[in-house]
């Protein structure tokens, strides 16, 4: 170990001990929670590949609203629909802020995006632009040709590999990345491969354990250990690529195609003005990074889980394939066909319920002292909503940890944020604005995979033997990538 690293750790240890010894004892009526260790509090209880399950298990013992001390960060976790409603509806404005983190400040241009920006007028106006201009249902439909073109390419690749195992996980990640990059940046990103590589490094960084996140006084460790320099280098790589994209879009001028990508929209809004603040290139780049980071991991993970559950339940696979093959006329699926694929939509909803793409929603921060369920929540408290625990709440769902798409038949519950037993995209002011876009990247590809191909497990593997061990980063995915065998069905073989 380097001498500088040893000195840093010694200084950090002394700081932590001093913090623990001198911390005042609160007299507030905080929610109950597990016992806290000296100095670290409850940090050790979140060091798990599946923290949403750990927190659900703790909530069963200590209650649906629970207090954890994560280093210096006072944290409240809610794990039932009733308490989620308290946070995201009843007291939504009190919990509309985001905690400030070093990484969000670096990667998202001082948190000038939509996901990490503090609650206020800037965030409200940018969210409005996002909702009305960038990710409206009409705008998402306008990208249908991009999705269709990419699925056509994927289908040809699968046809050429029919009968041999393919890595379904890698394939869907590539597909989702291609669509999101083209819809966001158009054809002008010459460095897409580098961009995607750096984006995944950013996602890993955002979800990685960082001691200074729990002890703000230890930010110097990020400098001494070289982490901050590494993050700044990554941000510079992203900025250089996005700067080239903006220059390319501006150089097109009146020669632009009829298809407006999201950068076109943001530059148009910037040039038009009419807001209470001046939109800068940094604002544009921050929002573009939101689009790129928010959709890539979550959409591909949802597709992976949906196909995994169908491989584990062959009767569901057959029912879904029978439906799509009876609805589609010709050899091409259009997005209008999706409206008639009722069972497929049930499969997607059940996948989102049981395998919430972000099981612990993006953290919120309490803006002011308030009271929830009889407990004091001090200002600046970090709030975690366990969306997965809400989606598997036994008081809300029968047999909650089983995959049963039929539970949504004739069921009015949906994922739009009004039903707190089902909040894969969040709810309230901070609900994910990319909900419609994200769904388009799951339903349409899944319909294509089920229509054009039959599927089997490799090497004689039985459905119940398929490993469904989870691992959590930004989203929760399979620990071991899904490898399956595409086969061209006789009914549509050429």
From Swiss-Prot:
Q: What class of enzyme is it?
A: oxidoreductase
* Pfam family of the protein (one): p450
Provide the E.C. number(s) assigned to this enzyme: 1.14.14.150
GO CC annotations, alphabetized? membrane
Highest rank taxon of the organism:
Eukaryota
Q: Provide the leader sequence positions.
A: none
Q: What does this protein do?
A: Hydroxylates germacrene A acid to 6-alpha-hydroxy-germacrne A acid, a precursor of sesquiterpene lactones that spontaneously undergoes a lactonization which yields costunolide. Costunolide can then spontaneously conjugate to glutathione or cysteine.
The family line of this record is: Belongs to the cytochrome P450 family.
User: By what name is this protein known?
Assistant: Costunolide synthase
Species annotation: Cichorium intybus (Chicory)
